[in-house]
Amino acid sequence: MGRAKKVVLAYSGGVDTSVCIPYLKHEWGVESVVTLAVDLGQGAELEAIQAKALRAGAEQSLVREAVQTLIADYAFPAIQANALYEQRYPLSTALARPLIAQLLVEVAEEVGADAVAHGCTGKGNDQVRFDLAIAALNPKLKVLAPAREWGMTREETIAYGERYGIPMPVQKSSPYSIDLNILGRSVEAGILEDADQEPPEEVYALTRSIAQTPDEPAYVEIAFEEGIPVELDGQRLGPRALFERLNALAGSHGVGRIDMIEDRLVGIKSREIYECPALTVLIQAHRELESLTLTREVLHYKYGIETTYSQLVYNGLWYSPLREALDAFIRTTQKSVTGVVRMRLHKGQAVCVGRRSPYSLYNAELATYGEGDQFDHRAAEGFIYIWGLPTRTWAQVHRGSGA
């Protein structure tokens, strides 16, 4: 008996997911494989990917467009949360996985499949993200992961695919593993596995090297409404258009390159290269607007929430009660995060040079050291006395007694 009768496979057209089709049928006895390719703005030729899946033996090859959903339902909440895993990675790949899982489950229910499958190996984070998301959305569905079990080397995997007439896209001159969507691009493997080696320029595609960026900076004004970016330079844009324009502008100035050692959920450290031009600028601009509009107590408490939120998303717990609860808190904080932030993009740096909001808590008359100062300096002495009372009491007990 096969492991499942009908399987919906998350399909990218790459080596692993292409080989999964004949492997599921010939090695695991699956009767029917339906592939699902999701358009997340990666720029792939989806019609060619559909045709490739059918040639590889899929009964049906489907495509779902989900760029707007990825940005509006996943990236925008992450921007409101200032989500940066280990303070650096803006979760461009991690945010896409629960959406793909949701579409997998929807298609499986539509076509009457009893299982879904993905091409993740047993070493990465994506296997956890897919498996947990699917379990949360439909625990009755089986989850198959052939690449996690087949035990083939890369060369053996390619040879297996060629045996079934599948054209292999990987060339020996391009050893990198790449993931791309409209939120960003991630690269690993090859020379990048040596943590002491500078990444060659060929690794990058969305951002220019500093040497190739313009000598003159670019300025962009980003308008937010309740923490959501809605305008660039006074022009209201939809989510996709906003990301496309800002990716191009920031990337041309070298903004958004990340070279980091990150801690994977499975317990290993991994060297990753990310390019996230728009996300990098938007999170930084959003933080600047929050500093203007949120109270000190909310701002400081939210810092801890942001770390937890980033870890949840990275660790595959998007569909969890805690993530939903954190989103509810964050949405409440965003009611006054409306305004405009002016960013300067230059030589790989995105720097805030101005911010304004109708809900600004910044009062120049209280902050100034010049004429018009309305701060009551006489109140400082009493404030310091009360604020320091616990410290003085402790000192009298411990210092005064000679302890």
From Swiss-Prot:
**What cellular-component terms does GO give this entry?**
cytoplasm
Tell me which Gene3D superfamilies the record gives: Argininosuccinate synthetase, chain A, domain 2, HUPs, Single helix bin
Catalyzed reactions: L-citrulline + L-aspartate + ATP = 2-(N(omega)-L-arginino)succinate + AMP + diphosphate + H(+)
Where do the annotations place L-citrulline binding?
89, 125, 129, 177, 186, 262, 274
Look up the EC number in the record and give it. 6.3.4.5
- Top enzyme class, one word, equals ligase
Q: Where does L-aspartate bind?
A: 121, 125-126
Cited InterPro entries: Arginosuc_syn_C, Arginosuc_syn_N, Arginosuc_synth, Arginosuc_synth_CS, Arginosuc_synth_type_1_subfam, AS_cat/multimer_dom_body, Rossmann-like_a/b/a_fold
Determine the domain of life of the protein's source.
Bacteria
- Membrane spanning stretches: none
**Which Pfam families does the annotation name?**
Arginosuc_syn_C, Arginosuc_synth
Where is this chain primarily localised? Answer: cytoplasm
Q: Where in the cell is it found?
A: Cytoplasm
| Pathway where this protein functions | Amino-acid biosynthesis; L-arginine biosynthesis; L-arginine from L-ornithine and carbamoyl phosphate: step 2/3
An example Gene Ontology molecular-function term: ATP binding
**Which residues does ATP bind?**
10-18, 119
Q: Which PROSITE patterns match?
A: ARGININOSUCCIN_SYN_1, ARGININOSUCCIN_SYN_2
Q: Which family does it belong to?
A: Belongs to the argininosuccinate synthase family. Type 1 subfamily.
- Subunit details for this protein? Homotetramer.
Q: What is this protein called?
A: Argininosuccinate synthase
Gene designation: argG
